[in-house]
Design a protein with these regions (language model features):
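Gly/Ser-rich catalytic serine loop of serine hydrolases
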Residues: 64-68, 127-132, 174-192, 265-271
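C-terminal cap/linker of serine protease catalytic domains
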Residues: 1-36, 124, 150, 192, ...
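A short, Trp-centered hydrophobic/proline-enriched beta-strand micro-motif
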Residues: 38-55, 59
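Active-site-proximal beta-strands of protease catalytic cores
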Residues: 43-47, 77-81, 136-147, 177, ...
């Protein structure tokens, strides 16, 4: 069962199973302020099932589990998108253990946010959005999963910096927190005023940043990243802006080089004949400095469907290949489609 992404190439984290596992590994928090204590009931459990023939099933699993946060009085829940990607069933569990069927409302690949809605709204108070820009180095906050105070951990912000994911994902000003929360996917980053500041995405081994000693923590997607796209995502399920070009490459940096660590089966790079272990040097004649530079140059090339020329290296031989980019959202199925 996939329970969240981590920073390695295996794609799925392996936290403890269910609420009991979280409680067993957390010390608990006492003397919570009233705003925080009241907000915790909005954190819900989320389970999804994914058909075996869906493309994400191999890497993320056919059963996924994490958290979400109730954000309105009509059952709307925000979570991290990979938990609901290609799911055909969604079940929400509230703080009292009630299981509520839900359905996918929207998923934004660029930010990573996912939205689902319960068929019947849970009888709990929703959490309001806060201002994630208020968080800076050493700011204090709480990380919460379903279960109230027993599933809550006090954390500090270890950094605010750019995060480049190997799956063609780039997030400005991501929030890194310590210590690590064991079941991070979709968990709530709650401000001291009880507002929602971020949604849990990753377990990372270098939460303190480049050049600092390795120290495990979590990466949270800032809630301010959701605000400008929220209304359209609720109304349409995805954004109407032209989709970014997508290659279907999983890229890692190794000894100063950009190396293909994996390829999406049937995606643009796969169809063009690229292989795991290939080294990327340039895109449309422009040298690639690092992964963020690669993504920015790819996305600046035009909308999805644009053809790009990659200069590659394989077994010490250089070659060029033209790849017709695709739309990631069309590669994956949406809900029960």
């Amino acid at each position: 069962m996939a329970r969240g992404l981590n920073g390695s190439m295996n794609g799925a984290g392996h936290g403890p199973t269910g609420r009991e596992g979280v409680e067993a590994r957390l010390p608990g928090v006492s003397n919570l302020s009233p705003p925080v204590a009241q907000a915790l009931s909005a954190v819900v459990g989320l389970k999804t099932t994914i058909p075996k023939d869906r493309r994400s099933a191999q890497t993320l699993g056919t059963e996924r589990e994490g958290h979400g946060v109730l954000i309105d009085d009509k059952g709307l829940v925000v979570t991290i998108g990979y938990l609901i990607m290609e799911a055909d069933t969604v079940t929400i569990t509230d703080i009292d253990g009630r299981e509520l069927p839900a359905y996918i409302v929207g998923y934004d690949y660029e930010s990573g946010f996912g939205l689902v809605r319960t068929v019947v709204p849970p009888p709990v108070r929703p959490m309001t959005f806060g201002d994630s820009d208020s968080l800076s180095l050493r700011s204090e906050a709480y990380v919460a999963g379903v279960g109230g105070e027993k599933a809550t951990l006090k954390v500090k912000v270890a950094g605010r910096r750019e995060f480049a994911g190997y799956w063609e994902y780039l997030l400005d000003n991501a929030i890194f927190t310590v210590p690590a929360y064991p079941l991070w996917g979709g968990s709530a980053l709650v401000g001291m005023d009880g507002t929602l500041l971020g949604v849990g995405s990753l377990l990372v081994q270098e939460a303190l940043g480049p050049g600092a000693p390795a120290f495990p923590g979590n990466m949270y997607v800032p809630i301010n990243r959701l605000k400008p796209i929220f209304d359209e995502l609720v109304a349409k399920g995805r954004l109407s802006t032209p989709p970014r070009p997508w290659l279907g490459l999983l890229t890692v940096e190794h000894m100063g080089q950009l190396v293909v660590g994996g390829i999406s089966d049937g995606g643009p790079a796969d169809r063009a004949g690229l292989q795991r272990g290939d080294v990327l040097h340039a895109l449309d004649g422009e040298v690639l400095d690092d992964i963020p530079d690669f993504y920015r140059k790819l996305w600046a090339s035009g909308p999805a469907g644009t053809a790009v020329t990659l200069r590659m290296e394989r077994d010490n031989d250089s070659f060029e290949v033209t790849v017709r980019t695709g739309d990631r959202a069309r590669y994956h199925k949406f809900g029960s489609d």
